[in-house]
């Protein structure tokens, strides 16, 4: 063995004066009054090593080394209270190089300030940075915690296939050509949707897995290109509320244990309908740490003669203690409004005596002024901002203005995890061509069941679909599944699919549902997104050991890469120019 102790575990009073063997990487080399100091780093921490100059000849930073020496207390002036081992040091009798390090492309301790492309190319160096390695170790701890939690809740872990059939719904698939069956393809699963539903039909009451999911879609700060992981679970004989309670139990316990003592929404989490979320927050992913609320003033300006507002949807946001802000603040908000597509951002300011001023004040009809004050809940020293457009745009713009105001005014505190469920999504919507399509998951049960599908306007039908949102980030989506074959066929027919098409596209699911399928429901909290929140990471790639870059490239291994003509022939593929 190269070592019997790690840097932190050897920092003990009982070991003082004993000869120890350590191994790790050279984090730094310093000269202090003619004495050489080497900081030895392993995955537990750092230990200071005192060495002679001749022992450090030809040793470079980040080389891996083997150290033999005696543990002793540091001199008082050399104590470092910032690290666990700060009272101890090793007096080296021998230092040998195990692996020499070439010229470094960047300093490991400063790697988080290096361009991402370089960090990913030398990810093996980037991960030596204790901040980065700590995140990956935390990922392992959380995986362990979640598995134990699911076992404690009575769930059975089942791995579903990675090579499966392509699905016509959802995002773009990653396709894998078959060598054996010319012209046919496997697909990497976007989610274990069909398999987990079939497990419920198979008699499993509670299923879960930490499921890898593959989607060929563009990246965002909170969405990794290529692959991601989710805590996928499903329950048989379950209502929506049964799933909500399990989701609350999992997330509350997880964030209580790993959430750095931040405040957490206690169960039951607020239930907010999609309609209410769009009306009050302008988003179906509301950040409830932001206490600003959107209200509707369309009736106030109806028939007012003010062309910019009359006949349109008018939204407003009352911001307390904002009227004394300098003119530059209001100009900046107006510039932001224009940058997102608005004509401009009107406002009224109220002083301490509730005297109004601002460009919109004169357009409020006198006989509706009190109603305006009541609806907006205007108060001394507040400002009221106005957003006007056609309804979908007005809601969207109001949501963006609400977020911008909170960020500019420092209204969002980072000491809280605010959870909520978003419920009652529309089952259908119209696309740009006016065609009725599914809004979200096509396998969801419509509220009202088959009767609603037969007798209601499709655009009025709500689905048993739900999201979990935390601090403005969608952590999970889920649904009560449509387990009735007749209802499933009708749901797809409304979206333009014939019965034959449904059966041909989803033969295994349709066939399984014909054999006594139980009512079932589930959800799948995004594992990477949960880790982002728990580590205060702004980019999902920070919580993945070997992520693709934002262009879906693995710059470490060079994927996607060219393959030989022979490999292409074996899988019956020809590349077109």
Question: Which residue stretches match the model-derived regions?
Answer:
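Class II aminoacyl-tRNA synthetase catalytic cores and aaRS-like
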Residues: 1-577
